[in-house]
Curated annotation (Swiss-Prot):
Record family assignment: Belongs to the proline racemase family.
Species lineage: Bacteria, Pseudomonadati, Pseudomonadota, Alphaproteobacteria, Hyphomicrobiales
Induction, as annotated: Is up-regulated when the bacterium is grown on t4LHyp or t3LHyp as sole carbon source.
Keyword terms of this UniProt record: Isomerase
EC number in record: 5.1.1.8
Job of this protein: Catalyzes the epimerization of trans-4-hydroxy-L-proline (t4LHyp) to cis-4-hydroxy-D-proline (c4DHyp). May be involved in a degradation pathway of t4LHyp, which would allow A.tumefaciens to grow on t4LHyp as a sole carbon source. Can also catalyze the epimerization of trans-3-hydroxy-L-proline (t3LHyp) to cis-3-hydroxy-D-proline (c3DHyp) in vitro. Displays no proline racemase activity.
Binding site for substrate: 85, 94-95, 251, 256-257
Active site: 93, 255
Catalytic activity annotation: trans-4-hydroxy-L-proline = cis-4-hydroxy-D-proline
GO molecular function terms listed in the Swiss-Prot or TrEMBL record: 4-hydroxyproline epimerase activity; trans-L-3-hydroxyproline dehydratase activity
Signal peptide: none
Protein name stated in the entry: 4-hydroxyproline 2-epimerase
Length: 345
């Protein structure tokens, strides 16, 4: 084969959400910090080309993300990574941290210790501690100690053409979220409503980013509302979520960074305290354990340290390559399967 670029990937899913972990063949990513590497991926033509190569057709699919492993910068970290999606590279993700941890352990890149292995992941948002329960050579469950999460603004109200005034919380859990009580748009969080939820999420994300500017007070590379997460409460008290992702799909997992952002709003409203735990349930019924382990501050703002626990499962191992004569090397997407915003890719 005459490929001019070859990368190895290990396919993992976390509670239904796919994270394809790049384990070999990636070029060196410039930057002295992971935040600088994230910025390069999102601003340099070479970074954009690598992201498109891995995430778009014919090599990529709408479902899931690509987790690009990087050499760690921090002396305590075992590995660093950024999350590649069709829109851009992202700073942090709970489900992708679980996928990366599972891949590192089950591939042997990090030595597995039974019954428990602790891995420190370095992200652009900070260090994430992953405590993996291990047995018989497999990673059974991963508990993440997430980055400090904080509220940007509660009860933001915006005008919408379809639902009138919609109220949302803008909160940070590793990236910024608009958190919306789903009943405001006349829907429930279930698989049959996935397409309608996605369309609503794309509309609301566009509207809120037009009206507000959000920037992390300490990490300026992290800015803008990345996702809209719809939320509801099930009969058993579990929080049901649906995170909508550009260009138009629903997260299959309960969403780790989204639940971290939501936990910050619950703490701000006095609804949870240190030591509390609860279940979060996704649109497909998969679950995370969510906990409030500690409180802290970020640039003078009250913040929480969330824990998120879930399972990762490996299901594939493959290579992707680029033929130098392939006219579609830059990748493409179409609205038939990629969602309503695919025409803007």
């Amino acid at each position: 084969m005459r490929w001019k670029r070859t990368l190895q990937l290990l396919d993992v899913h976390c509670e239904g959400e796919i994270g394809r972990v790049v384990t070999g063949g990636a070029p060196k990513i410039p930057g002295n910090t992971v935040a600088e590497q994230l910025h390069w991926m999102n601003t340099d033509p070479q970074g954009e080309a690598l992201r498109r190569f891995l995430t778009l057709e014919p090599r990529g699919t709408p479902m899931g993300s690509v987790d690009l492993l990087l050499p760690p910068k921090h002396p305590d970290a075992h590995a660093a990574f950024v999350i590649l999606q069709p829109d851009q590279a992202h700073a942090s993700s709970g489900s992708n941290s679980i996928c990366a941890t599972t891949a590192l352990l089950e591939s042997g890149m990090v030595e597995m210790q039974e019954p428990e292995t602790v891995i420190i992941l370095e992200t652009a948002a900070g260090l994430v501690k992953a405590t993996a329960t291990c047995r018989d050579g497999r990673c059974e469950k991963v508990k993440l100690t997430m980055v400090p999460s904080f509220v940007h603004e509660l009860d933001v109200s915006i005008d919408t053409p379809e639902w009138g005034r919609v109220t949302m919380d803008i909160s940070y859990g590793g990236i910024f979220y608009a958190l919306v009580d789903v009943r405001q748009i006349g829907l429930t969080i279930e698989k049959a409503n996935a397409a309608k939820l996605v369309a609503a999420g794309m509309t609301l994300k566009d509207l809120v980013n037009r009206e507000m500017t959000v920037v992390h007070p300490e990490i300026p590379a992290i800015s803008g509302v990345a996702y809209v997460m719809f939320r509801d409460v099930d009969a058993d008290g579990s929080i049901r979520t649906c995170t909508t992702m550009w260009p138009g799909r629903a997260d299959r997992s309960p969403c780790g960074t989204g639940n971290s952002a939501n936990l910050a709003t619950l703490y701000a409203r006095g609804k949870v305290k240190v030591g509390d735990e609860y279940k979060s349930r996704s649109i497909i019924g998969s679950e995370f354990d969510v906990g409030l382990s500690a409180v802290t501050e970020v640039a003078g703002r009250p913040a929480v340290i969330p824990t998120i626990a879930g399972r990762g499962f490996t299901f594939g191992l493959h290579q992707v390559g680029l033929d130098p004569f392939d006219p579609l090397g830059d990748g493409f997407a179409m609205t038939d399967v990629w969602g309503p915003e695919a025409g803007n890719i």
